Amino acid sequence: MANTVSAKKMTRKIAKRTAINRSRRSRMRTFVRKVEEAIASGDQGQALTALRAAEPEIMRAAQNGIVHKNNASRKVSRLAARVKAIAA
């Protein structure tokens, strides 16, 4: 338990930051899930639209420190490859 004023303030800040990060991570995962559902349905048009919406969200999460930028790039790349494979 925090005793000093500064420690109590840091506890509040951490709780606030954690809530924001949880929200951003959830938002990113929701967009990724929409792409994966579209891929599973086999509809390339819908999957491509979902991917175009998800890519900025994933990169924004990387910019905000939710995921590493290489992790974000890898997610986008793999999703794009899966969307492209639908046509083949």
From Swiss-Prot:
Q: Which NCBIfam families match?
A: S20
Under Pfam families, the record lists: Ribosomal_S20p
The similarity annotation says: Belongs to the bacterial ribosomal protein bS20 family.
Query: Is Transcription regulation tagged as a keyword?
Result: no
Its GO CC terms are: cytosol; small ribosomal subunit
Listed HAMAP family? Ribosomal_bS20
Q: Which PANTHER family does the record cross-reference, listed alphabetically?
A: 30S RIBOSOMAL PROTEIN S20 (PTHR33398), SMALL RIBOSOMAL SUBUNIT PROTEIN BS20C (PTHR33398:SF1)
**Signal peptide, first to last residue:** none
Name listed for the protein in its UniProt record: Small ribosomal subunit protein bS20
Molecular function (GO) terms listed?
A: small ribosomal subunit rRNA binding; structural constituent of ribosome
Which GO BP terms sit in this record?
translation
What keyword terms does UniProt attach to this protein?
Ribonucleoprotein, Ribosomal protein, RNA-binding, rRNA-binding
What job does this protein perform? Binds directly to 16S ribosomal RNA.
Q: Does the keyword Aminoacyl-tRNA synthetase apply?
A: no
